[in-house]
């Protein structure tokens, strides 16, 4: 399997072009799911609480919207992010994938798993940027995938999974999460955000980024790029560059 490269002894996922990738389908954006009474148990690896939690946050309007989009493609397989958290293996993405699969009559794929532990849930914005995720498992060439996770913040995990699948011959038609803020829904970086980032960051930082992660700024998510832009505007390019380099060294150690 391809889709990853080794940097300083660490395996990191590559990414693919966004093209016309749609916004993330977010089931619940009103508030966080962390206040749900079953959240801690589900996040720590208990499947029954995870299924109960997912059921409480799904509604017909969202499911109809997702179903309408997915029907544009043949034989779509739902693939959850298998994420390792500090407290255990998070079961919410798997429970969400099972619910989507059963309700929409799709196929479930669990052959691809996270090969590295990123623990992004506990990270700040800079930490999320530099903690890359790699995957392993069989991708079926030509297969259409709907990738799902419990929550989206910057979208890095979903972007990494998309890259792994597509570099191995699959096609990711959409991504969906159970929870997330509405302004996190846009995955594909916009021309205006990319232009602003390149103007503020300069060629040297983008070259460093490419050397570290194997792709340039055009393959960042919209939320990742917006975050870097805000940090540069607030603290200046020198401070942000130093923070990124320090966080990258810590993540690689």
Give the predicted meaning of each segment:
Residues 2-32, 162-253:
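PRPP-dependent phosphoribosyltransferase catalytic core
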Residues 73-86:
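Short glycine-rich phosphate-binding loop at a beta-alpha junction
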Residues 103-145:
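Short, glycine/charge-rich flexible loops or terminal/linker lids adjacent to PRPP-binding catalytic cores
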Residues 143-170, 174-175:
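A contiguous pocket-lining binding segment that forms or flanks enzyme active sites
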Residues 36-58, 117, 121:
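Acidic/glycine-enriched edge-of-secondary-structure segments
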Residues 54-76:
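A short, well-structured juxtamembrane/interface segment
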